[in-house]
A protein has these predicted regions:
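GHKL (Bergerat-fold) ATPase N-terminal catalytic module, capturing the glycine-rich phosphate-binding loop
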Residues: 1-180, 188, 195, 590-595, ...
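GHKL/Bergerat-fold ATPase module in large chromosome/replication-associated machines
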Residues: 113, 131-154, 174-178, 184-685
Length: 685
């Protein structure tokens, strides 16, 4: 006899909330339905194991059946089933109090509803206009019953014709959700959410190629493996088992470096396998490869709140019943179990890396280039991971040799300590472009690190804070004798006038490059060093690089690139240029320099006179006189600079020296490079 009624009065608001707030994530309904079927099957197995069920368990397969013509999707199990009383208890009456408070709390975070307080079943109404439950309990003498509801609080329950125990959940798919009547869509969702559920899940039959087409066989198409690798005892597994499982998870990925098998049952339950992938340089492309499961049911691959951010670069699976199927981000951030899990995983990762380093240093070094970005990311983002990793993190020098932090400190402390007692770490980020700078450092007996990774700039900044009395400088940041200052630098013996003239010779001929500034300086570097070098200030270069990582540093990113053109006043060619410039410009400069000298003397007198007066005591005539004299000085300097520039533009040695320095830094390109090559040929003839 049919019975009609209303689902418990406290549920009147639930259906609109499900429809409205869960609509954007309605795919999860299938996970909930299949998960419930698996639970019912598992409960029957438990009852049988305890002796509370004496019958035959039989086929435990959960079946998902699609009937496009009828517009239905059915999930069937042979689990414990339900009596009419149990339907009333678990379906008609939702077993929690304070539903209004609950809805107010979670309406802005819809995912938190499903999975709490027995609401998982109701996710079916996200896609169905009507839901039917046809069920028969495992209990002796139970009658089969059919429950139906159209999404309103009203329901109907009646006797049903069902011989076998278990439940069939029949979803009549709504008109606006017809995509869930497509075979490919259901296969996609089953593969996503149910791939490792603990009992077999069948969807249709397997097919085989016969008579030029695919035809169905009698064999069930089982979409899941019921005993995934992470549920097995590590001691029973071989390396090939882990590699095969990785290929199952990530068919298109390269073979992993190594892995960690997690297995803990106190103070929380956690199993899983984490793989170290061969990480490429782009960190952002590597995230969201860890899959989170709850009792073998897929939850999410957005695990930032569950594992520390740097561990999201790992691949693999984490399974924990202590993390609910559906949780909000704020829940993850505050839950004590989640925090313990994050700490545990971090420690296990550090322990695994440390053990590989200690047990097989050679293998560890071979894998360092792939591990480096991961370990650096961890050290930058987690203080406790830095404390562990500092003992197995490595430096790599330009010759491909590896050192721990402590080993490298011991290596360089005698030769690379400056006059102020600071240990100077020299590094390069491009061996080819910085070759001559690297060789100059080696000729001094210095060691040069290779730091060409995506995170090396912030890593350098951090290490300068962590390592006592230490600083890092790129090998092309200055001339070699000023990278590690052992004693006061030798002074150039040029006069002020010679310094100004020589600087203008080269300054006037520097190329006009976009967002680039050149500053000329003169140093006495010795006859054996290069005549002209280009260096880039370490601080400014590093700040520009850091602007790509940190918000609020855009100011540095917008600034032009600044380079120093260092002229070696001891070099024969530079001396030749200066002597030639003095000879060819002497006559033209003579009256200009004489006038300049006179105007500068007058300007000095005017400044001296006005400096003795208060601002209000200086007359307008005196102010004008000072301004006009300053203008006259500037005009004469401009005349001098123009004369020198006119000379320099036709001096092939000047252009050749500049271009050689630019070429050394990879800055000579296009038409300028072509002109350099042609000039070189002409000078050789």
């Amino acid at each position: 006899m049919a019975q009609k009624g209303n689902i418990g009065v406290t549920t009147e608001n639930i259906f609109p909330v499900i429809k409205k707030f869960l609509y954007s994530d309605h795919d999860i309904f299938l996970r909930e339905m299949v998960s419930n079927a698996v639970d019912a099957t598992q409960k029957l197995k438990t009852l049988a194991a305890q002796g509370d069920f004496k019958g035959e368990i039989g086929d435990t397969t959960v079946r998902v059946t699609l009937d496009k013509e009828a517009g239905t999707l059915t999930i069937s199990d042979h689990g414990i089933g339900m009596t009419e009383e149990e339907i009333d208890k678990y379906i008609n009456q939702i077993a929690f109090s304070g539903v209004t408070d609950f809805l107010d709390k979670y309406k802005e975070n819809a995912n938190a509803i499903i999975g709490h307080f027995g609401l998982g079943f109701y996710s079916s109404f996200m896609v169905a206009s009507k839901v039917e439950i046809i069920t028969k309990s495992y209990r002796e003498g139970s009658k089969a019953v059919k429950w139906s509801c159209d999404g309103s609080p009203a329901f109907e329950i009646e006797d049903a014709d069902k011989a076998e125990r278990g439940s069939d959940i029949v979803l009549h798919i709504a008109d606006d959700c017809k995509e869930f009547l497509e075979k490919n869509k259901i296969e996609e969702l089953l593969n996503k959410y149910c791939k490792f559920m603990a009992v077999p899940v069948a969807f249709g039959k397997k097919t085989e190629w016969k008579d030029g087409k695919n035809v169905e066989t009698d064999e069930d198409n089982i979409i899941n493996g019921v005993e995934p690798l992470w549920t097995k005892t590590p001691s029973t597994l071989k390396d090939e088992d882990y590699k095969n499982f990785y290929r199952t998870l990530y068919p298109m990925q390269d073979e992993p470096l190594f892995w960690i098998h997690l297995n803990v049952d106190f103070p929380f339950n956690l199993t899983g396998i984490l793989y170290f992938p061969r990480i490429k340089n782009n960190i952002d492309m590597q995230r969201n490869k860890i899959q989170l499961y709850c009792n073998q049911v897929f939850v999410t691959d957005q695990v930032e709140g569950i594992v520390p951010e740097f561990l999201t670069l790992l691949h693999g699976v984490i399974d924990s019943p202590d993390i609910p199927l559906n949780v909000s981000r704020s829940y993850l951030q505050s839950d004590s179990n989640v925090k313990k899990i994050a700490t545990y995983i971090t420690k296990k990762v550090a322990d695994r890396l440390s053990s590989i380093f200690k047990e097989n240093r050679k293998e560890y070094e071979e894998k360092w280039d792939d591990l480096k970005i991961f370990i650096n990311y961890g050290m930058l983002s987690q203080e406790d991971f830095y404390d562990r990793a500092k003992d197995f993190a490595l430096f790599k020098d330009v010759d491909g040799k590896y050192f721990t932090f402590e080993e490298y400190k011991t290596l360089i402390k005698d030769n690379q300590t400056d006059k102020d007692g600071n240990l100077v770490y020299l590094y390069a980020n491009n061996k080819e472009e910085q070759y001559s700078y690297i060789e100059a450092a080696k000729n001094k007996g210095y060691s040069v690190l290779m730091m060409d990774g995506q995170l090396d700039t912030p890593m350098v900044n951090m290490l300068e804070q962590k390592l006592e009395k230490s600083r890092f400088t790129r090998v092309d940041a200055d001339i070699i004798d000023r990278l590690i200052v052992k004693e006061d630098a030798k002074k150039t013996d040029l006069t002020d006038e010679q310094t100004a003239n020589l600087s203008q010779v080269f300054r006037s001929q520097m190329p006009k490059l976009d967002k680039t500034e050149f500053f000329v300086e003169i140093q006495a570097l010795g006859e054996a060093n290069q005549p002209v070098l280009i260096t880039q200030n370490e601080y400014m270069r590093r700040m520009k690089a850091m602007s790509q990582f940190q918000a609020g540093m855009n100011f540095y990113g917008q600034m032009p690139n600044s380079y120093n053109i260092v002229l070696n006043s001891d070099h024969e060619l530079v001396k030749k240029v200066l002597a030639d410039a003095e000879q060819h410009t002497a006559e033209a400069l003579k009256p200009v320099l004489a006038e300049l000298k006179g105007q500068e003397a007058r300007l000095a007198v005017l400044h001296q006179s006005q400096d003795k007066k208060k601002p209000e005591e200086i007359t307008q005539e005196e102010k004008d006189d000072l301004q006009n004299t300053q203008k006259a000085v500037n005009d004469e300097k401009q005349k001098r600079d123009n004369i020198i520039a006119d000379y320099a533009k036709d001096n092939n040695i000047v252009h050749q020296l500049i271009d050689l320095a630019l070429l050394q830094n990879g800055m000579l390109k296009g038409a300028a490079l072509d002109a350099f090559l042609k000039r070189s040929v002409c000078m050789i003839k």
